[in-house]
Amino acid sequence: MAQPPPDQNFYHHPLPHTHTHPHPHSHPHPHSHPHPHHQHPQLQLPPQFRNPFDLLFDERTGAINYNYIRPYLPNQMPKPDVFPSEELPDSLVMRRPRRTRTTFTSSQIAELEQHFLQGRYLTAPRLADLSAKLALGTAQVKIWFKNRRRRHKIQSDQHKDQSYEGMPLSPGMKQSDGDPPSLQTLSLGGGATPNALTPSPTPSTPTAHMTEHYSESFNAYYNYNGGHNHAQANRHMHMQYPSGGGPGPGSTNVNGGQFFQQQQVHNHQQQLHHQGNHVPHQMQQQQQQAQQQQYHHFDFQQKQASACRVLVKDEPEADYNFNSSYYMRSGMSGATASASAVARGAASPGSEVYEPLTPKNDESPSLCGIGIGGPCAIAVGETEAADDMDDGTSKKTTLQILEPLKGLDKSCDDGSSDDMSTGIRALAGTGNRGAAFAKFGKPSPPQGPQPPLGMGGVAMGESNQYQCTMDTIMQAYNPHRNAAGNSQFAYCFN
């Protein structure tokens, strides 16, 4: 069996010679020395392990391994006799030398602290100057600054946590003596400057910006601050509109009246508040609700730059005609108001339930029997509108369902009517015809008394064709106006 070469790195020195000795060796001698070899006790090994390199050399790692022969070795191996002069020097021992800790004097620490207050990080010129001045190495100075920055960060975090836990801090509160001087410069200097690390307490009075843009929390803020924001709001309104008018020349007398009415409400509440603080809580809540409603009403009335007018659902709006164009609103007379009320009730029967954005015509069943004596509209072929609805049992195609929509103007010409068209015709017959429909083109000439329903001729069809188109557009636009806000409205004619 071929023997591999002995490992030359075993114990950092070459292995001893392997020629035959006068005395038998069971393993190579661990140390090479000039004096005669010391004999070790004979090991009882199996005959196949007589050659020591058959066991000690590991072919996988290329190094000597004792694990193969360990079961055959005695528990107590005799130590070879090694003289002290033959021990390995310290340079051959793979051990990291322990670095001695640097002890700084009090004068050095004071000088380092002074430089740390000037700047937490060292530049190359400062490092060279400071190390030469203190007779220290540059590595020692850099390590001291690194540890000092870490300690400063920990102290800053602890101080910040204490400030948040005990918020708000009293003006006379001083920091502990253990804090670094850099943090003491940020503390309250006799109550003259606010603490930079502590958030300021809640302000006593809100600004006009908060009062204008945070109107949702207006009531809760009033309860907390005891009504001081009313005086601030009054001052804001006086500065914005000193003459009592609106934001521009287009403001109406209604807006001016509401402005003065709101000022009177504010002044009245201020007098009640300053007369005594023992007002019952229930009366105070009622005043707050009334004031909040007035505030919201005034705020929405003044915003005229928006393209679509914002409507508050709970407020009565009797001063405007909603069935006319929203570009040409005008005041209504008594007869016109009654007709408009009927038409508005037919267009949106539930004001709080928004209807989908689908155009309604005279054959729509949702308008049947809603108004005062409003029967269902009858189509041209004497077919009721309820028959046009798909209840799931009939198998109508889309073209069959949309067929009544194509004959919309024809059905209007034949005299089929509902409450919406009646209200619009009554409105168009008054003197407000030009104001109501000036946007959509030239209005039809004034008509005489209309013939009974179902008896219309060619002349009546020509005069009512324009009106039927307007009815359909307004019926589709009313639910969109109530629900859509500032979004655009589009109507497609078939």
Curated annotation (Swiss-Prot):
DNA-binding region: 97-156
Effect the entry attributes to changing A337S: In strain: Z95, Z197 and Z229
Tissue: Maternal expression is an anterior cap concentrated in the cortical cytoplasm. Its transcript is produced maternally and sequestered near the anterior pole of the mature oocyte. After egg deposition, it is translated into protein, which diffuses toward the posterior, forming a long-range anterior gradient.
Stretches the record annotates as Disordered: 1-49, 149-210, 263-293
Name of one Pfam family that matches: Homeodomain
Keyword RNA-binding: yes
Cellular localization per UniProt: Nucleus
Biased composition (Basic and acidic residues): 154-163
GO biological process per UniProt: anterior region determination; anterior/posterior axis specification; anterior/posterior axis specification, embryo; maternal determination of anterior/posterior axis, embryo; negative regulation of translation; oogenesis; positive regulation of transcription by RNA polymerase II; regulation of DNA-templated transcription
SUPFAM superfamilies listed in its UniProt record: Homeodomain-like
Gene Ontology molecular function: DNA-binding transcription factor activity; DNA-binding transcription factor activity, RNA polymerase II-specific; mRNA 3'-UTR binding; RNA polymerase II cis-regulatory region sequence-specific DNA binding; sequence-specific DNA binding; translation repressor activity
Region span, RNA-binding: 433-440
InterPro entries in the cross-refs: HD (IPR001356), Homeobox_CS (IPR017970), Homeodomain-like_sf (IPR009057)
Keywords: Developmental protein, DNA-binding, Homeobox, Nucleus, RNA-binding, Transcription, Transcription regulation
GO cellular component: nucleus
Keyword Transmembrane: no
Compositionally biased intervals (Basic residues): 14-40
Assembly description: Interacts with Bin1; in vitro and yeast cells. Interacts with bin3.
Record-stated family: Belongs to the paired homeobox family. Bicoid subfamily.
Function in brief: Segment polarity transcription factor that provides positional cues for the development of head and thoracic segments. Forms a protein concentration gradient that patterns the anterior-posterior axis during embryogenesis and promotes the expression of anterior gap genes, such as hunchback (hb), ocelliless (oc), and buttonhead (btd). Binds to regulatory DNA sequences containing a 5'-TAATCC-3' sequence motif. Also binds RNA. Interacts with Bin1 to repress transcription of bicoid target genes in the anterior tip of the embryo; a process known as retraction.
Stated name of the protein: Homeotic protein bicoid
UniProt source species: Drosophila melanogaster (Fruit fly)
